[in-house]
A protein has these predicted regions:
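Loop/turn elements at helix/coil->beta-strand transitions in domains of secreted/extracellular proteins
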Residues: 69-72, 97-102, 157-163, 168, ...
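Active-site-proximal beta-strand/loop segments in catalytic clefts of secreted hydrolases
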Residues: 76-80, 104-109, 164-169, 191, ...
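Conserved SGNH/GDSL esterase-like catalytic core that processes O-acyl groups on lipids
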Residues: 74, 82-178
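Histidine-centered active-site loop/cap adjacent to the catalytic His
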Residues: 273-310
């Protein structure tokens, strides 16, 4: 876990965790399922416990997990997917692995295919034929909605696993009578209607950069605290809707827990201020990570795919 706000401390108790200054590190070396308790503590007022959650951490042997399997994987998302930075690293992680994957989709190039569309929110995929200069490959003109069966008929692409990572752009827009979770549920129902055996991962949209330096770069004049709250409400809704659905082949992909929001976002070097030439690093994009951040997304995708039971 990275980038805790300054007023709280996230700590844990268990047999495999290492408490560092800026994060908790899970450092198990032996395959198994480990019990762990996460605690959020207020550092300013007598250290009260604000929240606590018991979790199970499953660790698999990378050398043998899903050995011999070959699966087609589709990433469906917004600009985080469309920029095509984490997909090459996913392929790299599976190079020489006992499990092989093939990334599929109508966008991207070479082996780094996907279904990412910059600027898109969940309702764009469900209800829009095109948006932001990009066509919706899943849009059925007859029903005017997302239709996975139509997509397969048109594209001939049939994945074994679909990982949906959407919600960030929903923060900036209001949807008439729907929420991000409602729209993702619509997409999931359509996919499962085509083939209930397709595994679906719902990736929690990544949090914004810890620094407020870039809050004026996008959505100027919007309070960064308000944006941060909205960005956190979306994964909360996703968790409420899709948790504990593993028996239905629906899984949460906790990408959000593996992003270093303090150190792995894009920065520039500039003067401290107009009268001080001391050089400082400032975040220039609060939404899109730097390459190390995308590589952390790839790490999460790799771990999810290696842990899947087919």
């Amino acid at each position: 876990m990275y980038g805790a706000v300054n007023d709280v401390e996230v700590s844990g108790t268990g047999t495999i965790g290492q408490q560092l200054t800026e994060r908790l590190r899970i450092n198990a070396t032996t395959a198994g399922t480990y019990n762990y308790t996460l605690n959020v503590i207020d550092k300013n007022v007598d250290f009260p416990l604000l929240a606590s959650q018991s979790i199970s951490v499953k660790v698999v042997d990378a050398a043998s997990a899903n050995s011999g399997m070959s699966k087609k994987v589709m990433f469906l998302g917004d600009s985080i997917t469309d920029r095509n930075f984490f997909e090459p690293e996913v392929n790299n992680l599976f190079t020489g692995d006992s499990m092989s994957i093939q990334l599929v989709g109508s966008r991207g190039s070479g082996s780094n295919l996907h279904e990412g569309r910059a600027g898109w929110g969940t309702s764009d995929y469900v209800y829009s034929q095109s948006f932001n200069g990009r066509d919706n490959a899943f849009f059925n003109p007859s029903s005017s909605t997302f239709d996975f069966s139509y997509y397969v008929a048109q594209k001939g692409i049939i994945p074994d696993v679909i990982i949906i990572m959407l919600g960030t752009n929903d923060t900036w827009r209001t949807h008439a009578g729907t929420t991000s979770s409602d729209n993702i549920q619509f997409m999931v129902n359509s996919i499962k209607s085509y083939n209930p055996n397709i595994k679906i991962g719902i990736a929690l949209n990544i949090p914004p950069a810890l620094s407020y330096d870039a809050s004026g770069e996008q959505n100027t004049f919007v309070n960064p605290l308000v944006n941060r709250k909205k960005l956190l409400q979306i994964p909360e809704g996703i968790l409420n809707t899709f948790s504990n659905k593993e028996t239905n082949g629906i899984y949460i992909v906790p990408v959000t827990t593996n992003i270093d929001t303090e150190n792995n976002f894009q920065t520039t070097t500039e003067n401290l201020n107009s009268r001080n030439t001391t050089q400082v690093q400032r975040v220039i994009d609060p939404i899109h990570p730097a390459l190390p951040g995308y590589q952390q997304i790839a790490d999460s995708m790799y771990a999810f795919l290696k842990n899947l039971v087919f």
